[in-house]
Design a protein with these regions (language model features):
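Short, solvent-exposed loop/helix junctions and linker helices
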Residues: 26-30, 60, 118
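Conserved AMP-binding/adenylate-forming core of the ANL superfamily
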Residues: 45, 49-103, 120-125
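Structural core segment of the AMP-binding/adenylate-forming
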Residues: 79, 103, 107-158
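A short N-terminal helical cap/helix-turn-helix that marks the beginning
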Residues: 1-8, 27-49, 68
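Active-site diphosphate/adenylate-binding microenvironment
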Residues: 22-27, 94
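Short, contiguous pre-domain boundary segments
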Residues: 12-22
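A generic structural signal for short, solvent-exposed coil/turn residues
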Residues: 3, 15, 41-43, 55, ...
Length: 158
């Protein structure tokens, strides 16, 4: 996989790395398909993501899991009307779903903006209008939902 995108992966020094490190990406490069799904094809059972929270909960995802879940997310977002060139805002806390949504959006060619839970109505409205956001994906949190709902009348593109 690495040799597909890198001429070299071993370097003798930092100076050698700075001088010779080059990433090759084709014009139609898509991180979701080319990297995540590529690793799933080569090493599907390898760990791609280990998520944990402050309460000690853990969830492990393989590359095969990420391929499958991100494809489902991409299909869901596509059914909701998102398409290449659109912009979405993700307000998902530090949840594992963030990574599935992010890769799913990448597969569609949708640019995404991560947002903190501390965003207010004013912050959400400004970011959505400035970036041309057409969708907001947010966590099931009373405060976040209230701020997004209150922002909706001032975000005609969402």
């Amino acid at each position: 996989m690495l040799s597909k995108y890198l001429d070299r992966i071993d370097f003798s020094s930092y100076e050698d790395f700075k001088k010779n490190y080059k990433v090759k990406t084709p014009g139609d490069f898509n991180f979701g398909f080319d990297i995540v799904d590529g690793w799933a094809e080569e090493k599907g059972d390898n760990r791609a993501l280990l998520w944990c929270d402050d309460d000690g909960n853990e969830k492990c995802f393989t590359f095969a899991d990420m391929k499958r879940l991100s494809a489902k997310a991409a299909n869901f977002f596509s059914e909701k009307g998102l398409k290449k060139g659109d912009v979405a805002m993700l307000i998902l806390r530090r949840r594992w779903e963030y990574w599935v949504a992010a890769v799913g959006l990448m597969k569609l060619g949708v640019t995404f903006i991560p947002g903190t839970l501390q965003l207010t109505k004013k912050d959400i409205t400004y970011r959505a209008n400035a970036a041309g956001v057409s969708a907001i994906v947010c966590v099931d949190d009373e405060y976040v939902i209230s701020q997004v709902e209150e922002s909706k009348p001032d975000m005609p593109g969402v």
